[in-house]
Amino acid sequence: MAAHLISQLRYLGVIPQTEYVEYGFEIEEKDKDPRLIVLMIDPALFKKHDLMFQEAPDLCYQKLLLELRSETADLPVSPRFSVTASDIAHYRELHPTIKSRKIGSRK
């Protein structure tokens, strides 16, 4: 999908579920009805990959942008898809975090 066709990409928020955490986005495109896209993250991935809950919305946003770049009229982005360990690794490469902070240094 050409980025210029999206007039607005809006983050709707977090929706905790029993088996996963959902992150909702709404896409508004010129001359089309708004689309709801939901990305899901298995809660176990947060601990396993040291992913902070505060990072998850941006991770989902970045993954959605990648999906939208490869979208075609014949193959639209799925309205629901999962974030994988591979997606987290890719995000970490582009957004390194400071691991040197110690828990005891917080007041």
Where are these regions (language model features)?
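Acidic, low-complexity intrinsically disordered segments
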Residues: L45-K107
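Short, charged/polar N-terminal "headpieces" of proteins
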Residues: M1-R35
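Generic detection of intrinsically disordered/low-complexity segments and helix-coil linkers/edges
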Residues: L5, V14-E19, M40, E55, ...
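A short, surface-exposed beta-strand/turn
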Residues: R35-K48
